[in-house]
C-alpha cells in the first residue's frame, strides 16, 4: 500500500474490485415537512479492496452522514449504493443487519467500549450479540487480535484501566474481529494525543497492508490524511475536486 496521499475525486485510480459504490447519492432531512434540508448532493464514491482512504472536510460538510449511509446506519434519500456488489435499496432490515455485520467494522472517535466487560470480551462483543455466546475458538481469535494490536497482557483488564490509546486499540481489534473487508473509522484519533494518534494510525495501516482490509477514515488531521492512499474532500455536501499538487 502507498502512503503518499494522492488527491482526486471519489473514484479510485485503480481498477480493483469495488467494495462500495455510490452513484448520485443524496440525503435529505425533513421530508414531508415544510422545511426539507438536503445535506448530501449527488455523491459519487467508490472504495476498492485494500484501499486506505481519507475523508476530509469542514464540520457540517456531511462526512458523518455519508459514513452512516455507507455503514447502513441510515438510509439514503435517492441514488444508488452497492455494497459488495449488492444494491442495498431492496434489502429489508434483517438483510441490512446481516450485510453490515459481515462486510463492515466500525471505529469511532469515542471507542464505545462497554465498561463492565474486559478488553477480550469487548473484542468478542459482536459475536456475543449475534450468537449469545463465544466458544474457545472465538476466545483464541480474540486473544490473537489483542496480541496483534499490542495488548496481549491487557486481555482481562476493564477499559477504565487502559489508556485512551489502548482503548482505541481494543476498538480496532473489535472492528476486525469478524474479518470484515471494510472498516469505517470516524475520527479514530481525534480524542488522542499526537503520539497515541500516530500509533493508532500506524496500526490501522499495518492491518491494511498485512490483511488487505480497506479503511475509509474521517479525519481532521492533515498529517494523517497525507499518509493515506487517497483523499476525498467533502464541502457543503458534495465531493470537491482536488487539483494535483
What label would you give each PLM region?
Residues 1-28, 240-245:
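ABC-family P-loop ATPase nucleotide-binding domain
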Amino acid at each position: 500500500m502507498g502512503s503518499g496521499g494522492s488527491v482526486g475525486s471519489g473514484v479510485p485510480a485503480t481498477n480493483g474490485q469495488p467494495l462500495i459504490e455510490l452513484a448520485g447519492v443524496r440525503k435529505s432531512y425533513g421530508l414531508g415537512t415544510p422545511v426539507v434540508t438536503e445535506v448530501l448532493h449527488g455523491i459519487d464514491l467508490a472504495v476498492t479492496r485494500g484501499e486506505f482512504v481519507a475523508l476530509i472536510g469542514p464540520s457540517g460538510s456531511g462526512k458523518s452522514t455519508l459514513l452512516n449511509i455507507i455503514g447502513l446506519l441510515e438510509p439514503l434519500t435517492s441514488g444508488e449504493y452497492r455494497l459488495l456488489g449488492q444494491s442495498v435499496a431492496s434489502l429489508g432490515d434483517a438483510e441490512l443487519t446481516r450485510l453490515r455485520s459481515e462486510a463492515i467494522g466500525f471505529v469511532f472517535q469515542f471507542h464505545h467500549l462497554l465498561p463492565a466487560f474486559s478488553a477480550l470480551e469487548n473484542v468478542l462483543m459482536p459475536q456475543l450479540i449475534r450468537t449469545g455466546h463465544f466458544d474457545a475458538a472465538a476466545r483464541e481469535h480474540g486473544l490473537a487480535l489483542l496480541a496483534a494490536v499490542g495488548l496481549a497482557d491487557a486481555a482481562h483488564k476493564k477499559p477504565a484501566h487502559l489508556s485512551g490509546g489502548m482503548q482505541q486499540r481494543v476498538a480496532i481489534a473489535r472492528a476486525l474481529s469478524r474479518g470484515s473487508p471494510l472498516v469505517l473509522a470516524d475520527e479514530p484519533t481525534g480524542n488522542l494525543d499526537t503520539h497515541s494518534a500516530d500509533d493508532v494510525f500506524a496500526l490501522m495501516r499495518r492491518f491494511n497492508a498485512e490483511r488487505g482490509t480497506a479503511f475509509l477514515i474521517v479525519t481532521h488531521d492533515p498529517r494523517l490524511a497525507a499518509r493515506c492512499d487517497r483523499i476525498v474532500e467533502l464541502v457543503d455536501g458534495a465531493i470537491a475536486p482536488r487539483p494535483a499538487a
